[in-house]
Amino acid sequence: MIPRELIEAVPKSDIHTHLDGSMRLSTLIELARARNVDLPSYEVEGLKKLVFKPDYKNLEEYLRGFRYTCAVLLDAEALERVAGELVEDSLRQGVRYMEVRFAPQLLAASGEDCVRALKAVSDGLAEAAARHNTSQAVAAGGDMPFEWAIICCAMRNFRRGMSGYYDALLDVLPGMKHRDLVSIASLEAVRVAVAARDRFGVPVTGFDLAGEESGYPAGHHFAAYEEAHRHFIRKTVHAGEAYGPESIYEAIARCHAERIGHGTFLFAADRIKNSAFADKEAFTEALADYIATMRVTIEVCPTSNLQTIPELGGDMANHPVRRMVDYGMAVAVATDNTLVSHTDINRELALAADA
């Protein structure tokens, strides 16, 4: 067992954190009041009881809170504020390197709005980081500077009502097959990330694919990942969180993922549905060997996994993180959503260490 005091004392990274799942409850309430957004409660304890619970029955209940957080993050002022507060909160937990991810298309009505959203988040992160980095402690060498980057997300799937951007796309292309629509949207998300980087200097370091995994394969977004690769944007994919090893395989083989978000069902050969993989155990072992050998990093978020994956039974003893480490894989422990999961990086590392 690693002492909690040691975990808290050392500088840490957090490279899998969703902005819209990691805001302060007090800020959510304040922004909702100012923007006339309906909440089920305007009290912190009320929201903890009704929405942001200690435990969730399923993924659907876990995701419910995002309808409220996204609703208050539709303008630059709110995005900048929430990004800055996330840096402040992370600094208090000892984080000194952070990658913040979000899907601009969820918070915008047009491509240009997406660029502005990325810039607003970048401005908020930069301002908060600068306050720390110009402090006396950092200047004297008693503390490390805070470094950060942004990961731009696209969604595996979307439907009408999710955002103004998606509604506009559905209106403009009403007869197009849905898989082609999501492919167009993710490709445009990469182009937005490149534009924000090249026009405004926004440090977009990576591209990610999030959202409903089952039924919406990563391969539908091949063009987006090719575009990201062409523009030197690193590639990660949420995979193996709600589907089996073949989802992780597709993320690596089709999208050239350098990192995998969650990967919880990496070793679950019994969840393979593709009949092309006749020997499921052999395929799973070969995939695990490749991930370990090629240093494809697995971004593990313990609390989030325990809250959304019933098969784990709420027990880290059932989580594959120990097996991943024993396999020689590169594993990065992260928070996922500090608000929704009621967590911080120290708690996540402690859970992983005790698994």
Enumerate the language-model features and the residues they cover.
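Metal-cofactor-binding active-site regions of metalloenzymes
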Residues: 1-233, 241-259, 265-355
